[in-house]
């Protein structure tokens, strides 16, 4: 009989405040709230929404089908509940923050999304990626409109520029063109790592201007002022270039052809940051004349734009100094009188206009910063996300307020709030579960945290040294920690106090293990010794009194000296042996009572980093930096099997206790290759691979009942993997892995074929073949074959009925019968409607030209029967564009197209009349409501503005 195993699945992840892969977004609280707002941040593959004031997690956005990290987040300008989130695999998902669900997902880029921006109306989204392309997405039709190519390296900045076209009225006044011949699709400003600054016209879908944005290499950031009249590009060596953008000129150029020589972007000069590393972000304040810029250092620089009066004052001061250096005082007085009136602010150097206001020092290296605009506060507020897993919120007094309070040039900023408790500042190096599996201890550099496993809440935080190992002592009230400096520290969970600290070793304590009888603990160190410590209750005198109080202490009982550094120690569950892994690649097994050598295990080519002994004390499993796992027998020390387990160093192994599925010989291994693997120690087979971490998996802990596993990695996350009731078989797992490998190579080869055709064009189609689109294309082809066969069958039946009215109905395909005896066209339409709008074009590209006549036959039937006309038109026009040359060359298609045109035109005219009638009726109803509700004697323009303000937000329209 084939052996089955129980599957482990990812259940929950916690411990991450904000990951370093993405930017952060500040959003306002609800109107009735008193907080300072919320922070929307990436946490590996999830998006988290934090209340900044309370430090509470409000919502968690997770798509179970997505396992890659989030790389970019953007908020819609119109609907504040809608967020676009870009991922490392090039996919984009639109989330509704109120209900934490995906509205629509797009797939068009080949690599990580670096930039996202919504347009003013909120119905288009621009995305930039590491694959150098920019794609414009239509959020209403849920399709990619087109792709812009031009950058030679990743896109580092992207902003919509949408000037409102102005025309001269007959009376000479200027009026805005909101719609009509003069309105355009707008423009896009983009920067790339290739140091190019490009201005794209979205109407002509081409680049109209290109500039070198940096003099010394790459451009890493782009900031555009709120009015779009200026922008700043920043790159290496602290250099920032200021550009002025002629928005009026852009608006006037709409629809004109003779503007090829006109330059809309002008270089105004260069500013230099205090720090010389590369800039990561430039963020203009939405309402005030400030901008923030930062690199990866522990500081964010806030710059201020001077007022016209200040610039004039500065220029006059400079001229006065220049005159003072001259020798003729009479001439100086005459020039001074002339200069007072003739100061031209436009001629001022850019360094006189933009000045550094304050440098805000942060608690960690910066990853992202965002301006916060809490209601009713006039100061500047900035939210920063750092690389050490925390969010900080700073208050900076504005220039006006600072001038009133003090005469200091540099204002005093304050670190008002932070979100840092729900995570460690550094990588977690050790994990330990309590005996009842309800509490989890995690140790990192500088901190030890105790978590509730069920609620994922952080119960206690202790300050400690650089922790390398930790363990719960029997009773689960005390945790012992071994540090890099050689200290052993005892912490009391209940009182949140440090009980005792012992200078145990001269080197780092790499391993701790509690004796199975629970009365002692052993510590293994880099000072080539293992020390045994007994737990003793000592009566300690209270300072200043004669009273004594009982206190737990560690008392050194004996020492085991070895020839090399000890990296790992383990007691056997039967308390007979203790195994020590040494730096010389060997594992030595000693008797616990006499400390005499029992076995010497040779075989690994690099040091053994971890080991574990099975619960029946018969097997010992060791893992090493040589990527191998070795299973040994503890009776003779023979190597049962060497498994090439991972693609990188194997950091930890742990046996699963006697659970419902195993005999205690199953074990887990974790590695630097970001995976955890589940093994059968008797059959020497890999049972399952657990993917989820986005960095090295430093530590693991298996529950005492074996019903779950906890892992911690370089991505700062703590992940819980639950044992499920689902059974898995080894053959099926191997087949699934091979399928995944095949699918990944299949889609990449398809993409490569598509790229060679139009790689040099500046404008292309926004398409990408994925497994989903390939399967959708196959479903369409299958539906067309079934549908055509059924149409021919029913046609023959109709002909037979003419000669013989009593002819028996034919036996139709079982699919049509199962769906309630529906017609062939209804079945094909149902298949087309089930395909996501974003994937439809790519699915249609899978169809060979031989299937096009069949598809057009059904499109004609859809037009005749008025079945989902928007979808019918969309498919028809896309297929005409794609197969234009073949269709023109085919005689048979011409007659078919004539029929489709006539039927479609009649149906569209009918729908147009219906929509016009309904629109007119809605306008009448709206007028009646307004007449009945507003009774004020006010002018008409105010009434219209008020009505627009009270209108509801637009919802997303699903076409298909």
Predicted regions: what they are:
Residues 10-16, 58-65, 102-108, 144-150, ...:
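Short C-terminal beta-strands that terminate individual repeats in beta-propeller domains
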Residues 11-45:
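Beta-strand-rich domains and repeat architectures in extracellular enzymes and scaffolds
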Residues 18-30, 67-75, 111-117, 153-180, ...:
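Canonical WD40 repeat/beta-propeller blade segments in eukaryotic WD-repeat proteins
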Residues 34-40, 79-84, 102-104, 122-126, ...:
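Structural hallmark of WD40 beta-propellers
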């Amino acid at each position: 009989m084939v052996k089955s195993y129980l599957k482990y699945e990812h259940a929950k992840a916690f411990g991450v405040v904000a990951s370093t892969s993405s930017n952060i977004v500040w959003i306002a609280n609800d109107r009735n709230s008193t907080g300072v707002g919320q922070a929307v941040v990436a946490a590996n593959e999830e998006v988290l929404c934090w209340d900044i004031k309370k430090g509470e997690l409000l919502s968690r956005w997770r798509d179970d089908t997505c396992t890659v990290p989030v790389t970019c987040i953007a908020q819609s300008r119109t609907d504040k509940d809608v967020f676009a989130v870009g991922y490392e695999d090039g996919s984009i998902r639109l989330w509704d923050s109120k209900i934490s669900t995906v509205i629509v997902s797009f797939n068009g880029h080949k690599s990580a999304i670096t930039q996202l921006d919504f347009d003013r109306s909120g119905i288009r989204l621009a995305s930039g990626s590491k694959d150098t392309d920019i794609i414009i997405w239509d959020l209403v039709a849920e399709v990619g409109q087109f792709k812009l190519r031009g950058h030679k390296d990743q896109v580092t900045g992207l902003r919509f520029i949408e000037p409102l076209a102005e025309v001269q009225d007959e009376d000479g006044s200027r009026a805005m063109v909101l719609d009509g011949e003069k309105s355009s699709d707008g423009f896009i400003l983009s920067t790339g790592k290739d140091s190019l600054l490009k201005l794209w016209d979205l109407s002509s879908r081409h680049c109209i201007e290109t500039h070198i944005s940096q003099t010394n290499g790459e451009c890493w950031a782009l900031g555009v002022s709120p009015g779009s009249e200026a922008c700043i590009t920043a790159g290496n060596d602290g250099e920032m270039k200021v550009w002025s953008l002629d928005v009026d000129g852009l608006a006037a150029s709409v629809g004109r052809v003779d503007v090829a020589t006109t330059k809309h972007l002008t270089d105004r000069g260069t500013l230099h940051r205090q720090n010389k590393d590369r800039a990561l972000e430039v963020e203009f304040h939405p309402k005030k004349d400030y901008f923030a810029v930062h690199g990866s250092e522990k500081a964010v620089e806030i710059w201020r734009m001077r007022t016209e009066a200040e610039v004039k004052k500065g220029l006059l001061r400079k001229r006065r100094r220049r005159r003072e250096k001259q020798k003729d005082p009479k001439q100086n007085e005459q020039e001074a009188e002339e200069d007072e009136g003739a100061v031209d602010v436009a001629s001022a150097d850019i360094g006189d206009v933009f000045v550094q206001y304050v440098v805000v020092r942060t608690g960690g290296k910066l990853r992202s910063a965002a301006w916060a605009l809490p209601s009713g506060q006039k100061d500047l507020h900035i939210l920063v996300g750092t690389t050490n897993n925390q969010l900080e919120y700073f208050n900076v007094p504005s220039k006006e307020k600072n001038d009133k309070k003090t005469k200091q040039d540099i204002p005093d900023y304050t670190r008002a709030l932070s979100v840092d408790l729900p995570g460690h500042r550094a990588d977690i190096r050790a994990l330990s579960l309590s005996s009842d599996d309800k509490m989890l201890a995690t140790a990192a550099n500088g901190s030890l945290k105790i978590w509730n496993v069920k609620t994922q809440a952080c119960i206690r935080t202790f300050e400690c040294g650089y922790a390398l190992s930790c363990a719960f002592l029997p009773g689960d009230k005390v945790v012992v920690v071994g540090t890099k400096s050689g200290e052993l520290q005892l912490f009391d969970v209940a009182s949140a106090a440090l009980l005792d600290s012992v200078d145990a070793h001269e080197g780092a304590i790499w391993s701790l293990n509690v004796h199975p009888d629970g009365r002692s603990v052993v510590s293994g160190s880099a000072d080539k010794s293992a020390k045994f410590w007994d737990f003793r209750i000592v009566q300690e005198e209270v300072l200043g009194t004669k009273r004594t109080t009982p206190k737990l202490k560690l008392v050194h009982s004996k020492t085991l000296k070895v020839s090399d550094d000890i990296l790992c120690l383990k007691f056997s569950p039967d308390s007979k042996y203790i195994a020590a892994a040494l730096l010389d690649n060997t594992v030595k097994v000693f008797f616990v009572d006499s400390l005499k050598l029992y076995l010497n295990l040779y075989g690994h080519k690099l040091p053994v980093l971890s080991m574990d002994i099975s619960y029946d004390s018969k097997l010992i499993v060791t893992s090493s930096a040589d990527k191998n796992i070795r299973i040994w027998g503890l009776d003779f020390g023979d190597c049962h099997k060497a498994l090439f387990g991972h693609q990188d160093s194997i950091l930890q192994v742990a046996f699963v206790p006697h659970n419902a599925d195993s005999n205690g010989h199953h074990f887990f291994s974790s590695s630097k290759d970001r995976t955890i693997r589940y093994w059968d120690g008797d059959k020497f087979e890999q049972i399952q691979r657990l993917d989820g971490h986005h960095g090295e998996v430093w530590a693991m802990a298996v529950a005492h009942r074996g019903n779950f596993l906890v892992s911690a990695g370089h991505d700062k996350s703590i992940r819980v993997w639950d044992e499920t009731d689902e059974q898995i078989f080894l053959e099926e797992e191997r087949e699934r892995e091979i399928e995944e490998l095949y699918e990944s190579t299949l889609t990449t080869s398809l993409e490569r074929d598509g790229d060679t055709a139009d790689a040099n064009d500046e404008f292309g189609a926004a398409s990408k073949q994925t497994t989903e689109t390939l399967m959708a294309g196959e479903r369409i082809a299958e539906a067309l074959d079934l549908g055509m066969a059924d149409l021919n069958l029913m046609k023959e039946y109709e002909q037979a009925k003419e000669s013989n009215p009593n002819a028996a109905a034919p036996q139709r395909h079982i699919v049509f019968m199962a769906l309630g005896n529906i017609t062939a066209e209804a079945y094909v339409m149902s298949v087309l409607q089930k395909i996501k709008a974003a994937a439809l074009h790519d699915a249609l590209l899978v169809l060979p030209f031989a299937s096009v006549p069949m598809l057009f036959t059904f499109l004609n039937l859809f037009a005749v029967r008025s079945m989902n006309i928007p979808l019918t038109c969309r498919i028809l026009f896309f297929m005409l564009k794609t197969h234009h040359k073949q269709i023109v060359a085919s005689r048979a298609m011409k007659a078919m197209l004539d029929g489709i045109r006539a039927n479609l035109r009649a149906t569209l005219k009918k729908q147009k009349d219906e929509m016009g009638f309904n629109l007119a009726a809605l306008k009448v109803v709206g007028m009646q409501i307004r007449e009945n509700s507003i009774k004020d004697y006010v002018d008409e323009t105010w009434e219209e503005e008020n009505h627009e303000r009270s209108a509801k937000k637009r919802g997303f329209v699903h076409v298909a």
